Regions:
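Divalent metal-cofactor coordination and adjacent catalytic microenvironments
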Residues: 1-93
Length: 93
């Protein structure tokens, strides 16, 4: 599945949420996509070319949903996410 096709229902299903509001899920999707953009330097079109980014969005959404704390540990990026994003990274700084 392409990242541009990810919707609130698919994320809620992945998170196994029975009772949810769109206002809770939309910021997670937006933040996950922004993280991919800033980490890789890829455009929306380039991101859609790689279907492995679908799982990255889902994992990031789950991580943000499960770890809603005031001071997150910034040095603790999921290995799967780090590996997939690293494979497609354009900005190597």
């Amino acid at each position: 599945m392409k990242v541009s096709k990810i919707d609130v229902e698919s994320v809620a299903e992945y998170l196994r949420l029975d009772d949810y509001e769109e206002e809770q899920i939309i910021p997670l999707i937006t933040a996950a996509k922004a993280f991919i953009h800033s980490f890789t330097g890829l455009t929306d079109e380039e991101i859609d070319e790689h279907e492995d980014f679908y799982i990255v969005v889902m994992i990031l959404c789950q991580d943000m949903h499960d770890n809603r704390v005031l001071y997150p540990d910034k040095n603790n990026l999921n290995r799967v996410v780090d590996t997939i994003l690293g494979m497609h990274r354009k900005n190597l700084l």
